[in-house]
Amino acid sequence: MCGIGGIVSTNNSKIDQNIANDMKVSLEHRGPDHSSINYISDSECFIHSRLSIIDLDSRSNQPYQDDDKRYTIVFNGEIYNFKEIRAELQSKGVKFSTEGDTEVLLKGYIEYKSEILKKLRGQFAFAIHDAKTSSIFLARDRIGIKPLYFARNDDWFIFSSELKTIEQSNLIPFEPDIESYIAYLRHLCVPMNRTGNLNISKVQPGEYIEFF
């Protein structure tokens, strides 16, 4: 289990580093082996807390970037068939510097974009930032084993493995979703992409979302 998160200002405001650090701390229980914030710019940052499973070397620490630093990924989960995807990419001339599935996932996305999701076998939630297009790609495994929440308003886009991490940032106001509460009392689950907070949504199982 790892923890992922990110903050992007939609109006190019500078991120308060205290808020980013508080988010990092709130996710550290999900990944005790390494925790880090990557400030892609003053107004964009990705956060990761790592539980090492594959390629225990620090070279696979996250947030992870490609050699050109155009793409940044934070990834929670495990890609079971990453060796097969790696071999396929190598046959196309793609080079690798680690032995882990994070680099395979990132370079698979660079090669195939959203089509990489059709090739993945595993449990995962991840976010990829493209510095050239200023876009963010969020995706979640088909079963929904790994959680992923996000919110957006006029000033901020924020995502995290945990709902409380977004709420505690105070960047997104809390607004109770009464219909979700009623649904939970009736069915013991919150419907669709809802969370109980009208301002925060969850990526659904098998879904991907792009923000520009």
Model-derived segments and their meaning:
Residues 1-212:
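Cysteine-centered catalytic environments shared across enzyme families
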